[in-house]
Amino acid sequence: MKRTHYCGAIRKEHMGQTATLCGWVQNRRDMGGVIFLDVKDREGVAQVVCNMQHLPPEDFHHAETLHMQSVIQVEGEIRHRDEETYNPRLATGEVELLAKRLVVLSEAQPLPYSMDEDAKVREELRLKYRYLDLRRPQLQKALRFRHQVQMAAEKYLNGDGFTCIETPMLCKSTPEGARDYLVPSRVHPGKFYALPQSPQIFKQMLMVGGMDKYYQVARCLRDEDLRADRQPEFTQVDMEMSFVEQEDILQHLERLFKSIFRDVMGREIGYDFPRLTWQESMDRYGCDKPDLRFGMEIRDVTDLAAECSFSVFRRVADEGGKVRALNCKGCAEKFTRTTIETLTDHALGYGAKGMAWILIHDSGEVNSILQKYFTKAQWQTLLTALDAQNGDFILFCADKFQTVCRTLCGLRLEVGDMLGLRDKQDYRFCFVTDFPEFEWSEEEQRYMAMHHPFTMPYEEDLPYLMTDPARVRSQAYDVVLNGIELGSGSIRIHRPDVQALMFRALGFTEETARARFGFMIDAFKYGTPPHGGFAFGLDRLVMQLLGADSLRDVIAFPKVRDASDLMTSAPDFVDAEQLEVLQLGVSTAAEAEKHPQKKRPTMAIKTVAELAKLSLTAEEEVTMGEELNTILGFAEALQEVDTTDVPQTAHVIPTENVLREDIPAAPFDRDLLLSNAPTHTEDCVNVPQTFD
């Protein structure tokens, strides 16, 4: 038999036809002599009727003993369903297949968990048995949607003159940015390849080579901490263009995303993408990836706060910090004391030292400790600056610039969620431009490239590269959708003198720069066109368009938070022989074989938080998860401590018998038990009557 139809494709127009279906048994109902099977494939579900009068006895016996999720092939006639079995919820609900022949292609063993769509299954279990989880219609739909998004992007780029070119997966390690995944070389002992964090250098070399327009659906790998929107290996749609300026690329990107949206969502984006500079985005929204689905912009009141008598505000203003506020319009009567305390707790979690607030009732009555620190004129000026009206709730943060931005950005999103303002069906794109070229690293005590060392500064800022790096703006840009950064790009440095200055500003000696990027320095000597590019995360875009909660919902085989694969148990130890060939850690490998390390116990922080009734932010989940697993690891290490030769600990109370094995106690004597009873009848103790 050969499959003639998908299970989910049979319709009433096929009635009377002979069809062969293949799929997984999703449900079985034995009515005595007639067995109904729900058979599922990627297109949907078909009802198969196994009647002992129409099926060979052996085939009917198979139908009687089928386990759920067994794979079968069934041949029969498509017919109209009886009225009582009609199912309007299914596309195939009007028809069924009367089986004439049934073959079990693969018998399923009892399942590790329920495959019912409404079953509550732990994510760790679903990821361990990902091949079963992939049978869920929701996940299959997400992966097909992902394919459509990728095809739509490629369709646009192919039509716009781009050439798809693959770049190497085994690259040179350049320790700037995230950590590399390293691959040892067998042929060159002691040397390592790095798996690509992006095709950045290679696509620039393609521009030097005259390819003009390049794109690639590239696999990228970064050894960094995971979040809901981050995986160690991910897919990005990567592109680069020659002889372009920033404006050319921004216009190209807007057309690209509008085309993708039109093709896969069936909707037009009827607005031009707003553009904000990095500074403007930080000032108005507290972050460089603003969610524009709602307003509630941050207002700066530092100058006004500096004139009041509130010591916290004045001290922050005097020390060069910021005092900023968020007006939650119409929330005064909605926010209870508990709500305000919750927001205060969130503010503390974001690093603020507290949260001042003003509550203006609908009647005009004001609740706030702040009012007494302002003169009447100052107070009115403050309310006017904040557009404060009856019914508004205004919250304040006073601290260093970064702390204020982080806190008010987080609180803005918290309030947006409370008020239901972040509609998942509303898609708001924007560009963020003019990022700082450098950011200060407290850990390394030097300036680091905010994007990468190949980003072109603005021409007018070049004189400040060596004298005032914090002042230098880059020709870099991000595309943001609903508060999520989809991707980044920039105009690249194509002049050798500017690239040399950049390396010096980053603290590279000439020898270090040549050791890491010598081939690029040489390439720039032989004629390099002005060029720029962009890359966006395919996984992130799909996650946003589907309204998914995690990248794991749109990737076939994702990693978990510790970058492990629960299905294959990767990473894992390798044989000593493999390491010997690589001339790498031979003794360690031998020891690993003799004494395999125990896996450190871990516990999901979400589970602990739910049990403890805790409400944690994403940052708190990461921090507390690390602390919890550190404690578990410490407890495991304590269990492994050899206490054979450790002297017995001295105690205040006797401890002679604490390690004695338990033995049955001698039975109590009847007379002894009854001796303290006031009265007793036979073997029963008499007690006073308490209730009638």
List the predicted regions and their residue ranges.
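Alpha-helical initiation/capping and key positions within long helical/coiled-coil segments
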Residues: 248, 623-627
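Long, charge-enriched, surface-exposed interaction segments in small proteins/subunits
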Residues: 596-601, 606, 614, 629-692
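Class II aminoacyl-tRNA synthetase catalytic cores and aaRS-like
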Residues: 1-596
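Short amphipathic alpha-helical/adjacent loop interface patches that line ligand
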Residues: 23, 257, 609, 628, ...
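Small-residue (primarily alanine) positions within well-ordered alpha-helices
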Residues: 76, 609-612
